[in-house]
Amino acid sequence: GLTVEGLSFCYGSHRVLDIPRLDLPRGRVTALVGPNGAGKSTLTRVLVGLERAKGTIRLDGRALRAKERTRLGYVVMQDVHRQLFGAEVREELALGVPPEELTDGRVERTLSDHGLADVADRHPMSLSGGQKQRLVIAAARMVDKEIYIFDEPSSGLDYRHLRSTARTIRDLAEADKVVVVVTHDEELLTACADRVVQMRPLAGPTASTTD
């Protein structure tokens, strides 16, 4: 799994993260919960190399640089508009997937599983907010990564599509991936989380030391 040790991250003089150790095992869904400002989204960005922090992050015992974590990780962001690049919904699912892995029916099955078959030929930016959310989650299922981060993945989803999202998240964990979910949604927690990590805001600025 993923092991975080001695992790510290600051915005200016304000320390946002101070984590002596955190274990994120393969094969289980770890939920990060806590109030706004607790550093949940910042931690996920550090985990996949989008932010640099002090400390060590290991995958299966091997220390990883930020660039390696970016290559091995996939993030479903809260702002899904920044993750849509294809000209059609169907094309979006195939982006970044090696041609040999695009077996017959795989894209169509994934579209159907996420209630997107009827909009397969539309431009992703023409979809509703909930449809865009489902598309980005479906795309996560298509790529083969080791670390999956879902930041508020149930935003804009009705109950039926929340259940299909929870199923996708569980499928990834059952494929022995590291899966982390940031959520305030109790229904999603109940549907997919194996472990819950409670995060709290740190008080005040970091101590300043002068040698």
Model-derived segments and spans:
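The feature captures the beta-strand-to-loop junction immediately N-terminal to the Walker
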Residues: 33-35
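Helix-to-loop junction immediately C-terminal to a conserved catalytic motif
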Residues: 48
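Conserved ABC transporter NBD signature motif
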Residues: 52-71
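Conserved ABC ATPase "signature" region
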Residues: 102-119
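Conserved ABC ATPase signature
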Residues: 123-127, 131
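ABC ATPase C-loop
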Residues: 140-141
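Catalytic Walker B motif of ABC-type/P-loop ATPase nucleotide-binding domains
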Residues: 148-151
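H-loop/switch region of ABC-family ATPase nucleotide-binding domains
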Residues: 183-184
